[in-house]
Amino acid sequence: MAFSSGLWGPCVHMSRAFSQRCFSTTGSLGAIQKMTRVRVVDNSALGNTPYHRPPRCIHVYNKNGVGKVGDRILLAIKGQKKKALIVGHRMPGPTMTPRFDSNNVVLIEDNGNPVGTRIKTPIPTSLRQREGEFSKVLAIAQNFV
């Protein structure tokens, strides 16, 4: 280690051996697009059993390929392909919409019914305005933000 004084006071320079040992992992993306890691927030068996790889989005069912709250996506989860509904994302949205700490999804079947029987995290109230599409998902939600 070597010491030097800089503009903001003394600095410590680490040897080269320490800097080569550093590693980095990718953070979760703010918007949901292809290869984004997501978090399953319902109590379905498929979403809650531990697995060595996190679920990832492999397709977004809209025109621009960027998923927002209320969009449907296709997930790769435990070697299977499953549809999911986005119920929260990290990217800031319009005014008065909540920003979540993680990209949250609820697993759904092909006909739109949720796979689980309970949602563990709060979901945004903006989904209530589109009630016809998501009435069964809203019925199993416990908290709204």
UniProtKB/Swiss-Prot annotation:
This protein's GO CC annotations: mitochondrial inner membrane; mitochondrial large ribosomal subunit; mitochondrion
The UniProt keyword set, sorted, is: Mitochondrion, Ribonucleoprotein, Ribosomal protein, Transit peptide
Recorded hits in InterPro entries, A to Z, give:
Ribosomal_uL14, Ribosomal_uL14_sf
Give the main location: mitochondrion
Under Pfam families, the record lists: Ribosomal_L14
Gene Ontology BP terms = translation
Presequence range in chain numbering: 1-30
State one molecular function term (GO): structural constituent of ribosome
Write out the annotated subcellular location: Mitochondrion
Q: Which family does it belong to?
A: Belongs to the universal ribosomal protein uL14 family.
Q: How does it assemble?
A: Component of the mitochondrial ribosome large subunit (39S) which comprises a 16S rRNA and about 50 distinct proteins. Interacts with MALSU1.
Q: What does this protein do?
A: May form part of 2 intersubunit bridges in the assembled ribosome. Upon binding to MALSU1, intersubunit bridge formation is blocked, preventing ribosome formation and repressing translation.
Supply the name of the protein.
Answer: Large ribosomal subunit protein uL14m
Q: Which organism is it from?
A: Bos taurus (Bovine)
Q: Coding gene? A: MRPL14
